[in-house]
Amino acid sequence: MDLKQYVSEVEDWPKPGVNFKDITTIMDNGEAYGYATDQIVEYAKLRDVDIIVGPEARGFIIGCPVAYSMGIGFAPVRKEGKLPREVIRYEYDLEYGTNVLTMHKDAIKPGQRVLITDDLLATGGTIEAAIKLVEKLGGIVVGIAFIIELKYLNGIEKIKDYDVMSLISYED
């Protein structure tokens, strides 16, 4: 299935000059969403994954159906102040400032094999932060799966030491 035909492109959103790739049009088509989920499930099975991790919010909508299909758990990565129990945190730089992501301190057990999922790889900052959190808890990142990779932003450079799969790639 050619998933690219299900991606909507929104010009000048969220700001002028940006051509936003919207995956909600994959999700609102049961066949396309199921296909994308199944592809990531197969990728995860080959890596003997114990748990799925996904950053908010779209990492949830990619990772949760994969975890459910595999009969394994899902651990969320969230912005600071959004998780109710004790957390670990990772602060990283943005173009104009910083951001903080957190995970529950008991979300990952040492040695667990982790697949990180998200909708889109752009600059790689969010996924790099998720990797740092997983590894701080002793998890082993055995794969990272995206629906879309924006190759022209070179986000792969931040995660080049990991096994990465993307279902759709945009060169420009």
UniProtKB/Swiss-Prot annotation:
Under the heading InterPro entries, the entry gives: Ade_phspho_trans, PRibTrfase_dom, PRTase-like, UPRTase/APRTase
Q: Which GO terms describe its molecular function?
A: adenine binding; adenine phosphoribosyltransferase activity; AMP binding
Where does the UniProt annotation locate this protein? Cytoplasm
The catalytic activity of this protein is classed by the Enzyme Commission as 2.4.2.7
Q: What class of enzyme is it?
A: transferase
Q: What does this protein do?
A: Catalyzes a salvage reaction resulting in the formation of AMP, that is energically less costly than de novo synthesis.
Instruction: Specify the protein name.
Output: Adenine phosphoribosyltransferase
Gene that specifies this protein: apt
